[in-house]
Each structure stands twice: as structure tokens, then as C-alpha cells.
Amino acid sequence: DGKLIATAYYYKLLQYMIKFAQLQLDMPHTPDIAGQLHHQQLAEDIQEYRELAEHVKEGFNKTFWNQEKQYYSNNTVTANLLPLAFDMVPDTEKETVARQIIHKTVDYYNATIQCGVIGVQWLMRELVRMGRTDVAYVLATHTKYPGWGYMAANGATTIWELWNGNTADPAMNSGNHVMLLGDFLPYCYQHLAGIRNAAPGFKEIQMKPAFELEEVGFIRASHITPYGKVTSNWSQTAAGYSWEISVP
């Protein structure tokens, strides 16, 4: 549903505008009249963006939420995923929307990736956030169609433009379509390895690996921050797990 996607991203961009304006508002400003006027204008901008965002959110739910059937629009994974990821779903309906995503992904489509370049940007992190790390791991590792593992199992050395890049007719134009990787890499670093940014620019770091995934034998990961290298190396042992970390 193109209108749903456009409206959801309009709301998301308004949230970014609020953050950008707030960052400027929090910066020191000159005490002269020009500085005071700029400060006042930023405060007014924030209020305007907030009011517009609430209006968009209200209209979004009024237009796309099917109260009778308990899903958004045409009930695709992306249609339910975007409002959940962008915090547009009313609190009373969040669990219901999460269940729709799991049902569609696991039960209806046999635990395969059922979204394209738009939805896949948010799929893994939302599965983790809703507590379904088991589903996220299956999607990350299976070799069935459609999925990243299917590409690798069929000779891909980069990310295809299409999930069925080996059989598409007409053939795909791009064999290096990195955007279809979605949020898989953040999932690997932030969830599996547990290296998480807890403050802007990695000024603070949270370390929380996915020890609960018994299927994972070991993880070796590192990330270069502005303050130095962070590493997280862990492995399963007979007693539980062994974890080695280093921080700047």
C-alpha cells in the first residue's frame, strides 16, 4: 500500500524534524535579540511539528487500521511493521499488531522473509524488540526462498536486487543491491554481538549479547568508535558461555 508507506514515512520524518530542532534549541545561543528570536522560532517549530505529527498519526490509524480484522491496510508484513517500528500503533493494539507480523511470517509463510526493500529495513530490530529473537535468528540463517540464506545457497556473493535473482524473468538489473540487506548487519552487531550505542557517537556503550540463542556456537565482533575499538567475543561452553570484551 503506497499511501500507507508514504504516510508512515511522513510521520517518521516529522519525528526527525522534532529531534533536529530540539538539538539546535539545546545548543548555546547568543543573548542578543537575534539569538532570542532564533530560540523562540525553534520552540515554535518543535510545537508545530509535534502537532502535525499527532494529526498525521491520528489520520493514519483512522484510515489504515481495520478494527474488525485487527490489522493495518492489506495485512502485509510491511503494512503492520512500519507503524509498529515508527511508534504509530496505539498501546492497546501493539501486541495485536506484533502477533499479526509473527503469524504472517511464521505460520502463513513458513518462517521466511515476506517484505521487500521498505519493510526489511525494520524487520530484525522489531522482532528483537517484541521479544521474538527466535524468529529473527531463523530468518537470518535459513536457506529457503525468500531470504538472504537462499541467495548465498544459490551462488550469490553480493545481495541481489530480487529475492529470486537466480530465476527472475526478466532477469534483475542489479546483483549488488545492498539495500535489500535491510537491518541484518545492525542485528548481527547490536543483538548477536551485543555492541550497542547508548549515547550519541558511542559516548556510552551498552554490551548485551544474545546469550539466549543456544543455536549460536560463537560470535566474534568488533566496532571502531570515535573513542577506539570495541570488541565482543563470546562462545557457548558446557557451563554456559565465555565472554571476552574490550572497550576504549
Task: Report each predicted region and the residues it spans.
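Non-catalytic C-terminal accessory modules of carbohydrate-active enzymes
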Residues: 33-40, 51, 55, 134-248
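Catalytic cores of carbohydrate-active enzymes
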Residues: 2-5, 9-172
